[in-house]
Amino acid sequence: VFGIGVLAALAFTSVAMVESPSPVRAEPSQCNEFPEGQGSETVEGYYQPAEIERVVQQLEHTGQGVNTDVIGTSNQGRPIYSVRVGSGDKVVFLQAGIHANEPTGTIALVNVLKSLSDSSRRSQQVREAVTIVAVPQLNPDGAVPYQRENHQTWDDTVAMFPQLAGAPSAFYHSLPGPRFWSDPRVPGFDLNRDFNPDFDYAPQAGHLPGGGSVRGMYLTPEARASRDLYTELEQEFGLVDVFVDLHNQAPCNTFDDGEAHTPDLHTPMSISAQFLRDPGSHGAGTAYPNFGWDASRRANVAAWEGVQRGGSTFSGVTRYPQNLDLAGSANATYQLRGSASVLMEAGRQRHANPQWRHGFIAKVHELAMMGIIDSLVDNTFEDIDPYRYEEIPVRNG
């Protein structure tokens, strides 16, 4: 949420080949408990870091127009991979797994990469028009214990930045134990609070502990790896056209369809272009003159339309609650620097068949990503009215 023994059949299924399940409404039995025998969500069916390495190697060896790289290492020394597909003038940066207990974006991203690197004519057109740069799993250390945070003690952090000795720990560092939004097994940082649009920022003790509406400090090697990749893309392309961050949200979020006497409908995904309550106070239009507000709204509309192409099964995409103020998020940081920034929060479907559940969520992510990519390939992106963003219904709660 913005605030692994893999299923091989899902991991290597193209965007077009995932079977559409039946329409889903928000039923109490689905929302209040898992089906009998399912228990809570587990790591089964999701990628472990070693499996990501094998997938990346397979993409490089069998895909067309694919290049891979290690953009950094996690705090525990695991490689963080990027996959590049295509050579077009427009660049799309896709990122998954920043919160490692929200893992279906990784499945979806692998599916999209497999599809776009195949020999079909459409994939060739995409590769000629667009450069896709993807980080399938930004937080490999969190994937091992299946937690939101990375694995990094405050002592680890002070060892990296001795100037922080004696200062309080950052507000987004957690010790093991239940939280409202998480239940870390090992100490670590919420990576999606560690970003800062000032790429030259150096951590300062006087800025600790910080708070939710202030910028991050790049205390984690994972956030720095994402920043460094983005910097390289800026240097190559001048502007990173689109940035997408893939997340999961709680199951059975709903929205009001506007019809009287009908129950609220279940939303398969919530999306957002809004990450700062007062962008100007963070330098939008001044220090960051390319602030991508209109472009972000266009990209969200393209994602919305992409999911609608999946038919009624995937109807009901909503806007994430529009009161975010998360200056330390990747979305806010890259939007300030000029990218069309999109948050995608697909719901964790609770269904008796785990393959159905994972496949449904991954498919929603895939359709949304391809909606954006197709609009760039077909040169319709700039024709999208950004004010249509307001037509997307807002999620309840």
Whereabouts are the PLM-identified features?
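Zymogen propeptides
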Residues: D69, S74, Y81-G86, L109-N111
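Active-site/substrate-binding loop(s) of hydrolase catalytic cores
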Residues: D89, T104, N111, S117-T286
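Secretory targeting and sorting signals
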Residues: V1-S22
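Short glycine- and acidic-rich boundary segments immediately preceding or forming the N-terminal edge
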Residues: V24-Q76
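Short glycine/proline-enriched loop/turn "hinge" motifs that connect secondary-structure elements
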Residues: R84-G86, W181-P184, F199, T333-S339
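C-terminal accessory segments enriched in acidic
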Residues: V1, E27-Y47, A205-G397
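Structural recognition of the beta-strand scaffold that forms the well-ordered cores
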Residues: V70, Y81-V83, V91-Q95, V133-P136, ...
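Enzymes and membrane/adaptor proteins characterized by extended Gly/Ser/Thr/Asp/Glu-rich
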Residues: S87-L116, A295, A299
